[in-house]
């Protein structure tokens, strides 16, 4: 491959990664719109039913099936990914603003790095600990927004969902060693959707179908765009560029989510929101460069 072809390949890979980051960022906006007419369990169920239906045929086409010995791990990771992460996250999103929810989710990389140092023995140097401290302070500033009350439960639920993120990120490393990324993701989301279905039906009953066009469009974008397409784009891009460069694009999620919350939804913000957001994104950026942490 000559230099020009290599540069073109890098450009396409980085475009894919940036697109995935943006799609994850817009999920907070479309999530808020969907939650205006549906409960969090139904939004999560429909989102990942669509995502599974879009990705699973690819896994089957590639002939990738879970080994029997890995079924319990797929089931556990699926549960941690869909009900434990996104059901709790959407529940929190229904009680708080998209801006702060997006910024809290931006703390994911430092939190994962912290638990990886505890359970996987991954090195976390001074810059890593500084990033964790900065992200913690950033969340404290971001949630203390002006003119908003009764948002603490929602903020706490979104933060709680990040503990589930830690679980499935660390456990999915085992699956990543034995399965291609996109087929593994397809099976994880499928198992996760199956574990969510009884919870959603018991909690909120049968999903309504008499929804507005905006709500249906939001659900479709959440399932096909923010889940299926985003995961496929991310896995394709991350296989073609160094991990330290790929991780930078994760910072688009909190940035895009927070900006849309302010500009489109008109959510309250202030200097503390900006400073808190900057600390969170900066901390995630530091952790993205794992070799220097």
Model-inferred region functions:
Residues 29-37, 93-94, 140-153, 200-219, ...:
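Membrane-interface helix termini and inter-helical loops of multi-pass transporters
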């Amino acid at each position: 491959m000559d230099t020009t072809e290599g540069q073109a390949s890098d450009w396409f890979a980085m475009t894919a990664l940036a697109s995935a980051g943006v799609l994850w960022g817009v999920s907070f906006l479309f999530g808020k719109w969907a939650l205006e007419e549906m409960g969090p369990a139904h939004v999560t169920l429909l989102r990942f039913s669509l995502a599974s239906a879009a990705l699973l045929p690819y896994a089957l086409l590639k002939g990738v099936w879970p080994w029997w010995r890995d079924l319990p791990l797929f089931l556990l990771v699926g549960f941690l990914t869909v009900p434990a992460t996104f059901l709790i996250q959407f529940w929190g999103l229904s009680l708080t603003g998209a801006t702060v929810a997006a910024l809290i989710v931006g703390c994911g990389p430092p939190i994962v790095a912290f638990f990886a140092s505890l359970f996987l023995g991954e090195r976390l140097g001074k810059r890593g600990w500084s990033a964790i401290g900065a992200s913690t302070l950033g969340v404290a500033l971001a949630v203390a927004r002006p003119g908003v009350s009764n948002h603490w439960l929602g903020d706490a639920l979104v933060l709680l969902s990040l503990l589930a993120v830690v679980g499935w990120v660390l456990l999915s490393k085992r699956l990543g060693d034995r399965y291609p990324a996109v087929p593994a993701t397809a099976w994880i989301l499928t198992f996760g959707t199956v574990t969510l279905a009884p919870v959603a039906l018991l909690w909120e009953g049968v999903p309504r179908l008499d929804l507005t066009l905006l709500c249906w469009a939001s659900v479709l974008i959440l399932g096909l765009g923010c889940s299926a397409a985003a995961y496929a784009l991310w896995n394709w891009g991350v296989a073609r560029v160094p991990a330290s460069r790929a991780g930078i694009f994760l910072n688009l999620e909190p940035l895009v989510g927070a900006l849309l919350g302010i500009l489109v939804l008109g959510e309250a913000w202030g200097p503390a929101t900006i400073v808190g957001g900057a600390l969170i994104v900066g901390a995630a950026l530091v952790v993205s460069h794992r070799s220097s942490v």
